[in-house]
């Protein structure tokens, strides 16, 4: 695991990251055991957990976000299946001290694969649809049978790679960055930033401080891991991309397998730790992961979470807990900027060329 390798290199131990990972793995095992009793045996359905549990950053008090992904024919039994799974998950969540998915979010129900794969962009690509698709790619774990998840992810990546305007032209590119995929990841990051402002208004400020800190930390980490996946196509896998996309016959399956194995089925912390090991400076890595460890330590404190949930917007400037977390997020941001724009010249060039315009 890359985070352990980075800890060893730096001679540090990030206890909050370690504890959250152990708790997450315990929760996934408990869920897997409970779902096995539900006899979720069809290859057309996969139970998927997302969010902090999929990132292996789950702590007591976190939301247990999940969805039943259906990749097959419509069946009236899908509704009772999802209801039974909901009851099972809620029982496990109660045992672990986890919360139900937000009723205003896209989780806690079933989703069909058709729009997730076919509606990328355009009017049919709703906020919910985009969220499910990008989180499937960046922070999802299958519980039990995962054939449906694997098929859907493969088809999503096929669309991004085979319909990329530059790759589809058959003309070799100067760089092997999958811009279609990268643009959708960037779009999602900007969407959740805008939605933060929208939710503060809609909910009259309820829970805004907790969402603010998560946006500064865990949401940003997820976004970084997606950008690194796209940039690594040029920095680490260019030769394989050229062979598969611009050879005698286009064949994206080896590329998809690579992306699934090294990125989609890894969590954001490990993806970022691996990148820091390969091309980051020691001091930048220390600042980045120290800040993230502090964030997870604070999120594991129920009194802190409760305070952030209840904090009034107008009182935030005088609240020491929120201001400390905000200052910590500035250290995290500073390290992220150094990593992308100072530590490595090739990464700096890609960030300047692809991440803004």
What residue spans do the PLM features occupy?
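Short, charged/polar micro-motifs that form catalytic or ligand-binding hotspots
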Residues: 21, 71, 75, 79, ...
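Active-site nucleotide-donor binding segment shared across nucleotidyl transfer reactions
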Residues: 32-81
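Conserved nucleotidyltransferase catalytic core and NTase-mimicking acidic/glycine-rich helix/loop elements
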Residues: 151-357
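Amphipathic alpha-helical scaffolding segments
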Residues: 64-74, 81-88, 236-249
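Short glycine- and acidic-rich boundary segments immediately preceding or forming the N-terminal edge
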Residues: 1-24
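Non-catalytic terminal/accessory segments
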Residues: 1-3, 58, 120, 349-351, ...
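Conserved catalytic core of two-metal-ion nucleotidyltransferases
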Residues: 18, 22-40, 76-187
